[in-house]
């Protein structure tokens, strides 16, 4: 698939660019994290031409791929590891944008799902964060962690996670958006398979950078020990 090739190239060359690496390291990411999740960056976006409707839609929504240039690129992979969406971070305007292929719209998309899936299958539990950085941080303690890219699970996302997990644990931010997302999810899908936990006033990524890896793991485990027993 053409997005697989694009993501692979963007990941291969990201270490050549000081600005995105400095930013990612400032958010607590290591080179190992960057390689694991295939996070990338390109100055010029070149994507192999494809005659599909997906390609045409992506070409138009990204303004001939110019919207992907000079952005940090977080690939959204399906359960087979194929890229079916992209989340980008603009380092100048400090904004995120998301782009989905038709498959992602139909079955739901997450950041980190492919990497987390073996652990979700094993535990039958999944932790869901809003943002990619929080998911990467939390996954250092509990690898069965994904990012929903928003503070609410849509129907496709919920059904996809339910296929692999008996318990979906929302770890959203303790703010208005996070609280609303939790309540909306519980109202929409009920409490049978959904749970939620607040880890504190800050998010996972902030705690990781503040506490360091060892203290962070101890802190996170103390916050969700009761949920793990259920």
At which residue positions do the language-model features occur?
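TOPRIM metal-binding catalytic domain and adjacent DNA-binding surface shared by DnaG-type primases
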Residues: 1-71, 80, 120-121, 162, ...
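Short, functionally important structural connectors and interaction interfaces within domains
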Residues: 5-6, 21, 105, 145, ...
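Phosphate-handling DNA/RNA-contact segment within nucleic-acid enzymes
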Residues: 44-165, 182
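TOPRIM fold recognition
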Residues: 84, 123-126, 135-230
